[in-house]
Swiss-Prot record:
Belongs to the neurotoxin 03 (Tx2) family. 05 subfamily. The presence of a 'disulfide through disulfide knot' structurally defines this protein as a knottin. This is Delta-ctenitoxin-Pn1a. The keyword Secreted applies. Negative results: does not affect the currents in rat brain Nav1.2/SCN2A or skeletal muscle Nav1.4/SCN4A sodium channels.
Length: 82
């Protein structure tokens, strides 16, 4: 009886892991591929990952993703526009 339960558990685990692999193949593009991390090049706030980062073009010649100084303003703005 115990052997049958272990066998069925392994069978269910095998089917579950197969299902997860199929889902990964359906959606190959991850969130990290669509947005930039800190210090990544950007053109607008939506190019930066997370709600606390913004595209900063003010202090440097090239625009880069930086932590926002005013998160209370940046987070709702990114939720509405991105």
């Amino acid at each position: 009886m115990k052997v049958a339960i272990v066998f069925l558990s392994l069978l269910v685990l095998a089917f579950a892991s197969e299902s997860i692999e199929e889902n990964r193949e359906e959606f190959p593009v991850e969130e990290s591929a669509r947005c930039g991390d800190i210090n990544a090049a950007c053109k607008e706030d939506c190019d930066c990952c997370g709600y606390t980062t913004a595209c900063d073009c003010y202090w440097s010649k090239s625009c880069k993703c930086r932590e926002a100084a005013i998160v209370i303003y940046t987070a709702p703005k990114k939720k509405l526009t991105c």
